[in-house]
Each structure stands twice: as C-alpha cells, then as structure tokens.
Amino acid sequence: MCDILIFGGTTEGRQLAEFCAGHGINACISVATEYGAELLPQSEYVHINIGREDASGIAGMIEKLGVSAVIDATHPYAKEVTKNITAACTEKNVTLYRIKRADDAICESAIY
C-alpha cells in the first residue's frame, strides 16, 4: 500500500520520488517509459509503475493502492494524461495536487 500516487516524467516527479525515499514516505510513482523508471531512486519506499493509463486505469490504480492523494508532476504539455488523472481523482474523490512550473521556467528564446 502507498500513501501517495505520483505521476512523474519530469524533473519535479523525480525530485518528489527522492524526497519520499529520503523521508520514509511510501509512494507509488507512475511513469510512462522504462527510461523514466531508470531515473528514479531505488528505495523500499518508492514503488514504480511503468505504462500509460486512461482515466479508468488510473481510477483502478487509486482504488487498488488505497491512496488518499495524487500528485500530477507530468510534463506541462502532457494535457491528455492530466485530463485522465483529474477525471480519475474526481471519480474516486481523492485529493489531487498539480505541480506547475513557474512562468520564468519558460525559455525566453523558444519559439512556440
């Protein structure tokens, strides 16, 4: 059983996993790829799930893990997964926290 479910794939997701590992917080970290999993800390407190889930799959994870909170630390442009996470948390009545980057994290020289 995990205390929290973190959807990662960003630096912030990895940092949250490291924090949980260092503070004895049981966390399930869900990443889309094997590469994302390789970047996470190896710890008895960090449980890694690899793969992409739709809203129904995420709701099932929430129920199976029995978490009371979910953290969405996915990439800012990963709109679909954020939509699925939000729908699943609403369905399961679980608190959702979304990690957002500061506006100054946007590269001034980038062309969007």
Show where each model-derived region lies.
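Hydrophobic/small residue at the entry helix of a nucleotide-binding pocket
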Residues: 12
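Glycine-rich, highly charged phosphate/nucleotide-binding loops
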Residues: 44-62
